[in-house]
Amino acid sequence: MTTTKTHLCHYDQPLYHVGDMNGKPWPTSSMEGPLLSCSPYPEDWRAIARLGQAPIWTLQRLDGKPPKLVNFQRLSRSDKKRWLAKAQELDLIHSATLYKAQAGDDDQYTICLTLEEARQESESWVKPTKGWLPKPALNKFWYGSEKENISPFFAMDAAFTFLAKQIPGIDGIWWDDSYDPGNLSAPRVGIFPEKVKRLRRMHKIILLG
């Protein structure tokens, strides 16, 4: 895929995974889907994701370099258009009219598939919006099954994750969310499963080059 490189970055902060690492693939119920969830703030992430007493694993590359990640927030407008066009070409997503429904504060909202659902979710404002819905191929990538549907809230991110995985040398995705643990928000990283090797005794996760 032809694209600029402003969205490619080396993540030079320490990263941690909070979880048991009992199997592979790991559960796909998180916002990172099939990717291994990591964060520079493990204890905050433990609270946000309600992970209880799960152990903490440190993450490092085999060559000692920082992980190389894609940051979607740094994609230019023209790159986003190209990525969306590619995702549609690959039959990963399709456009749809969705509905924003206020949830909590005035600037917080949820995305609903129908106007009726949106009105049930909110007694305040409801607005139509252009959005994206997953197609079976994207559901299979994200969940391992076409029967589960990705939320419209995450469909574009899931499609971009699929595309980012095709870029040579990339270890995963960086979601540069605001650090606000009180509102269940913190920066997070998803590592592609193929990059992962575990060292159980040292509680380390090694990313293969």
Q: Which stretches of residues belong to each language-model region?
A:
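Active-site and NAD+-binding cores of ADP-ribose-processing enzymes
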Residues: T2-S37, P42, R46-G209
